[in-house]
Regions:
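Acidic/His-rich structured neighborhood in mature extracellular/periplasmic domains
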Residues: 20-160
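Beta-strand segments within the central parallel beta-sheet cores of soluble alpha/beta enzyme folds
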Residues: 65-66, 166, 228-231
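Amphipathic alpha-helical surface "interface" segments used
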Residues: 73, 170-173, 235-238
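An alpha-helix initiation/capping motif
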Residues: 140-141, 168, 207
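Small-residue-rich helix-loop
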Residues: 145-146, 163-178
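Long, contiguous secondary-structure blocks with strong helical propensity
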Residues: 45-46, 58, 153-166, 191-197, ...
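Pan-zinc metallopeptidase signature
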Residues: 176-253
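N-terminal mature-domain "stem" immediately C-terminal to a signal peptide or N-terminal signal-anchor/transmembrane
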Residues: 1-25
Length: 253
């Protein structure tokens, strides 16, 4: 079921997968020596999910599928379970990254990041927001940021450190830009641009600002367990933003 779902949601069809392999033949070939090491990550993934159960005791734990995709998704989740694209975690000594474009070179991670991406998609599986139509930039960014923040609590890291490293020195200016656009549905410059990112600006800054909102909300909460449940059940994103107090962290009032 996981392969069928990943094919539908992320790969598209066999021709698109073949095209990705043809465009990066040495990179895909290098995955053969890494995929047997996936088994080495299973204990760490299980430990991470056990910590997630401690954080959210009433959570659901779906099946996890590890698949080779077409370099466009590290993971996704739906009712089938969690689908992880292992080709996005092929960074290792000797990996031929020269075949990859700038965005892929920035985002391709190591196998050690697999527990964090599993945790991130696990959070998406738990989220219960009901949104009619396309989410606003605010809604989408908080959804992704909550997933990164809770994943970090369980896995000890999140999957977007390179984005944080770029964004933090520019935090105040980015907040002003985000605030002006957060109620629209244009994600350009903030989310899901992948290889279409412009210049040195990372493609997924929305993950960073959503993480900052989630972290601020959690740190201000007296009841941390209740705060985690509120993050997962959130239906009022403007109220969540206001309660986080994050604007003051960015120098606002």
């Amino acid at each position: 079921p996981g392969l069928e779902t990943f094919l539908r949601l992320r790969i598209g069809d066999a021709g698109k997968l073949v095209a990705a392999i043809d465009a990066h033949p040495r990179y895909y070939a290098s995955l053969r020596r890494l995929t047997p090491k996936l088994e080495d990550q299973v204990p760490r993934i299980r430990d991470t999910l056990r910590r997630m159960r401690t954080l959210v005791p009433d959570a659901v734990f779906p099946d996890v599928y590890f698949l080779v995709g077409r370099m466009n998704s590290g993971g996704t989740a739906d009712a089938t379970g969690l689908m992880i694209g292992v080709e996005m975690f092929g960074r290792a000594p000797g990996t031929p990254l020269d075949e990859l474009g700038d965005w892929h070179r920035a985002v391709v991670g190591e196998f050690d990041n697999l527990p964090a991406i599993v945790a991130h998609e696990w959070v998406h599986f738990q989220q219960r927001a009901r949104i009619d139509g396309q989410p606003t930039l605010l809604q989408a960014a908080i959804g992704e940021g909550v997933a990164d923040f809770i994943a970090e609590l369980g896995a000890g890291r999140h999957i977007n450190q390179h984005v944080h490293d770029w964004a933090e020195p520019r935090a105040a200016a980015l907040w002003e830009e985000f605030r002006a656009r957060m109620d629209g549905t244009d994600y350009a410059g903030w989310l899901y641009e992948g290889a279409n990112a412009r210049g040195d600006r990372p493609a997924d800054l929305g993950y960073w600002i959503g993480y900052r909102i989630a972290r601020a909300y959690y740190e201000r909460a007296d009841d941390k367990s209740a705060a985690l449940r509120e993050m997962l059940d959130n239906q009022d994103f403007h109220a969540f933003l206001a309660a986080s107090g994050v604007e003051r962290e960015f120098g606002g009032h």
